[in-house]
């Protein structure tokens, strides 16, 4: 309900590093997605004078487990037990611009995607695809929502993954490493969208942006700057890629590696759940992504030594 110094300080730092103009603090990534969806719908409602607008999301995407965020998640086994979900969602194929074009109607208000698909198998957006989607959004007055909840906060060597592409969203979501363990998320808006969407009372939060999390977010960004963590990720990530490539070359049951920065996946012919469990017994925490990908998402403080140990454990 009120502004306070820790919130203001955190918001200024977030807007400065992101190039966005407004930020709304939430408690989680899923809540940030909910806020982004509401913003897009309100924008289209004010523009067109009616409700019932649609959103285009990507197949094999993951945006959260609340009803709204699950509605734009393109992974069926997450959705199926909770159907029917929010209507007005169409799904297109990631990195397939023609597929996106085919889903656009006069009711489309937003296109939402992860800049790097995590749960879907560690697929980075192709540069031509992301720029093409941006161009489609500009041509049809559709808002581009980029989900940076997993791939943001320095993981790719840029504070936000989209910054490497130079394709700016209208709305962005962030969470996870934003508070380094403190529960906080956020959605960001350009000034143009902020001026033509949510009004006071349209959206709210009881605990989002409280003084504690505001101080935590500020401390995280101070640490990024003091330790040059973006530069560190750009230095250590190629070494991790090299170590994973060596494993792929050595073992026939490993097929290929893909990803960006410290967000890597290795396609595996063996049951990945069993491989992840065996790695845990060796003291290495890895997770799965889809049915056949081992996902490596180490902290941005990851070192060359840790990358070497990762290879040794595997």
Q: Which positions does each model-derived feature cover?
A:
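Conserved N-terminal phosphate-binding loop of PLP-dependent enzymes in the Aspartate aminotransferase
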Residues: 1-306, 311-314
């Amino acid at each position: 309900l009120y502004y306070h110094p820790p919130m203001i300080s955190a918001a200024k730092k977030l807007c400065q590093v992101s190039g966005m103009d407004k930020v709304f603090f939430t408690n989680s990534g899923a809540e940030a997605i909910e806020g982004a969806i509401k913003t897009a719908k309100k924008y289209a409602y004010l523009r067109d004078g009616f409700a019932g607008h649609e959103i285009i999301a990507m197949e094999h995407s993951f945006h959260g487990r609340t009803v709204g965020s699950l509605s734009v998640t393109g992974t069926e086994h997450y959705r199926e037990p909770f159907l029917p979900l929010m209507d007005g969602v169409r799904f297109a194929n990631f990195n397939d611009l023609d597929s996106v074009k085919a889903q656009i109607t006069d009711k489309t208000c937003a296109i939402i995607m992860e800049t790097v698909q995590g749960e879907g198998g560690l697929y980075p957006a192709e540069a031509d695809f992301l720029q093409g989607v941006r161009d489609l959004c500009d041509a049809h007055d559709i808002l581009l929502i980029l989900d940076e909840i997993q791939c943001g906060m320095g993981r790719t060597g840029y504070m936000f993954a989209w910054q490497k592409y130079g394709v700016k969203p209208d709305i962005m979501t962030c969470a996870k490493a934003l508070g380094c363990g403190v529960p906080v998320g956020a959605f960001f808006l350009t000034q143009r969208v902020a001026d033509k969407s949510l009004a006071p009372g349209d959206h709210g939060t009881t605990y989002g942006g409280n003084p504690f999390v505001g101080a935590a977010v500020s401390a995280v960004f101070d640490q990024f700057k003091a330790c040059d963590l973006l530069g560190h990720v750009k230095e250590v990530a190629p070494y991790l890629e090299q170590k994973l490539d060596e494993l792929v070359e050595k073992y026939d049951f490993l097929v290929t590696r893909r990803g960006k920065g410290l967000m890597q996946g290795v396609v595996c012919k063996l049951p990945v759940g069993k491989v992840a469990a065996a790695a845990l017994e060796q003291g290495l925490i890895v997770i799965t992504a889809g049915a056949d990908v081992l996902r490596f998402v180490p902290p941005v403080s990851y070192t060359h030594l840790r990358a070497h140990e990762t290879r040794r454990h595997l």
